Amino acid sequence: MDVNSGSWLFREEPLEVIKTIFRRALGAETVREARLLDGGLFNTTYLVTYGAGEERAVLRLGPVERHRIMGFEQNLMAAEAYLYAVCRDIGVPCPEVLAWDTSRTAVDRDFMITRYIPSVAMVNAEMTEERRHDLCFQLGAYLRRLHQVTGESFGFVSRVLEGRHFDTWSGAFLFEVEDIVGRLEAFGGLTAGEAGAVLAPFRRSRELLDQVRKPQLLHLDIWAGNVLLDRETLEILAVIDSDRAVFGDPDFEFAAPWMEDPALRRGYGFPEIAPDDRERLERRRLYRAFYLALDAYVGLGEYNNQALYRDKKEELLELLDIGKM
């Protein structure tokens, strides 16, 4: 499975380990098959057939080499379980969680088991442009519903569930920026001078960031690969991979490069940024810099992808107008 194996975080497990997980988590006495699914670079994912009735479930095993993962990624299974519970309550389709565990007793990794949904990922589905437009519009409406959920504090849900609450958006946002940039420097991806230059515009923008006063629940990973469709009707069956959710600014969600689809933005009713709205424009620039720094670190420290690291670092320094140091 070459598509998976380059990542430092990926590791296959023997069938006996998967049997132990299902026996302890679900009381399943038999596991007939565990088929590795393609595409996992962060988690290692299997489609598992188990039990006397040969039920099927998806097993997601968290990353190995946990010293490499970012701070907000340390508690993602709990965050995903939380998000799926919220989604069920507000009518956003999502997988059913059968079990999740962060004790690392059955296996030395976090894991989650969800009921298998026979489906096709939207990114792989053949459809007309009109149908794709309708689906993106519906996704925007679902996202709007999620953003209407508010929290009592700011920050990544994974952090909040660990008890790390931020009273301000700047506090939550800068905490993550400093963590990511610090990791880039520690792994040799930025010089000390570059790291300081990257952090400077964020640190001097606290007041600007704190104009955001309502902690709204963001998904942060809405794209066609994370949307499961019925193979026949092409209806949306589930929105998945909700573990990187944040209580924060909706503009942060829409600053991501995969959020440019016009139909999705219309379905959401997103208020586009006016050309003379300097404050929102500057926040968007900082948000885009965040995504570039994150992707640069993912390439360097997690996925063993030097091309991704180099490209995103170059874009980051260009966006922030930082020359070679």
Predicted regions and their residues:
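Phosphate/pyrophosphate-binding loops and the adjoining catalytic core of nucleotide-dependent enzymes
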Residues: 2-8, 18, 35, 84
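An alpha-helical support segment within catalytic cores of ATP-dependent transferases
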Residues: 13-29, 105, 125, 132-137, ...
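Short strand-connecting beta-turns/loops that link adjacent beta-strands
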Residues: 51-54, 105, 232-234, 289-292
